[in-house]
């Protein structure tokens, strides 16, 4: 796929690919879907050498939409993906044989940022709102917020911008009245004088964010590789929670943010909320299914069909996480 090789070129340009001197191990390509703090577990595991310690030589690439991510996963271009939102569930409902095996963040790590003249959520009626993509976390969060305050989708104009930085730019230019952003872009927007109308993490929405997704085929044919990947991933999560200096340095590299105050704020907000064991939750997946109202099977599908936490449960039973956090 042409776009796949373009993504590889972008990663090389950003300096986020594996170096030629990386230790030998089983080669594996993994992808992440957004430039936000919730995606950092994967970066941390890579930069800390956690995957190498478990015999894996992991290359990371960036694929900016859930749809393309699933295409790459099903097509075999990547073996493992870290993606936010309901895209993996929608793909499975349509026949893609993929499953969630871990979730690094089980709530919406987003904020509705608006122009200063927006004083209440009801003021969003009739306004232009920025999201990343239809079907994304930003899309779901916006529609959830509007529905909760009796504002119909047709009463606002949704504009897609791709990444949080582009939504922020649209706010600055006045193209939109509000937009859903993720950290650290949220912190930058607040510093520029824009208003944080809603912090979704305070709303208490349980929703799968930063899911680790694989194909059924990979899970069945390469269970040991999947296990070793999750062990390295869990070590990345441990570094997130326990090593602020390293985490902020890695975030700065991948997010291309140099402002130390913004990195400090981002880390202090997210590190305490990251789980020790990245289990998916039934309630989160159930709500994600409810967000897929246009999918005929979503109403009757069972959350258990969409994830397999066997590896995590086995690791916990064997004492892996207890040893990690001793």
Name every feature range the model reports, one short phrase each:
Residues 22-173, 177-183, 196-200, 205-206:
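Short, glycine-/small- and polar/acidic-enriched structural segments
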Residues 220-300:
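Secondary-structure end/capping motifs
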Residues 86-87, 165-255:
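Pocket-lining segment of extracytoplasmic ligand-binding domains
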């Amino acid at each position: 796929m042409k776009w796949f090789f373009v993504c590889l070129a972008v990663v090389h340009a950003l300096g986020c690919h594996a170096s030629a001197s990386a230790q030998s191990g089983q080669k594996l390509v993994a992808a992440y879907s957004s430039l936000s703090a919730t995606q950092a577990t994967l970066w941390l595991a890579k930069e800390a050498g956690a995957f190498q310690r478990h015999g894996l030589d992991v290359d990371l690439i960036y694929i900016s939409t859930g749809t393309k991510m699933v295409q790459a996963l099903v097509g075999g271009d990547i073996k493992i993906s870290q993606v936010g939102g309901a895209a993996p569930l929608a793909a499975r409902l349509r026949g893609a044989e993929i499953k969630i095996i871990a979730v690094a963040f089980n709530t919406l790590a987003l904020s509705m940022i608006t122009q200063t003249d927006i004083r209440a959520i009801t003021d969003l009626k009739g306004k232009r709102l920025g999201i990343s993509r239809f079907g994304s976390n930003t899309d779901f969060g916006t529609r959830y917020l509007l529905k909760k305050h009796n504002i119909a989708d047709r009463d606002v104009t949704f504009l897609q911008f791709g990444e949080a930085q582009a939504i922020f730019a649209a706010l600055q230019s006045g193209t939109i009245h509000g937009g859903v952003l993720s950290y650290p872009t949220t912190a930058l927007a607040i510093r520029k004088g824009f208003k944080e109308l809603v912090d979704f993490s305070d709303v208490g929405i349980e929703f799968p964010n930063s899911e680790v997704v694989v194909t059924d085929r990979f899970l069945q044919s390469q269970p040991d590789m999947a296990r070793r990947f999750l062990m390295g991933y869990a070590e990345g999560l441990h570094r997130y929670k326990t090593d602020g200096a390293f985490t902020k340095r890695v975030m700065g590299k991948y997010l291309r943010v140099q402002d130390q105050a913004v990195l400090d704020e981002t880390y202090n907000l997210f590190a305490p909320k990251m789980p020790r064991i990245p289990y998916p939750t039934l309630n989160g997946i159930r709500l994600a299914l409810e967000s897929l109202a246009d999918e005929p099977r979503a109403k009757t599908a069972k959350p258990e069909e969409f994830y397999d936490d066997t590896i995590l449960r086995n690791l916990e039973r064997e004492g892996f996480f207890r040893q990690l956090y001793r």
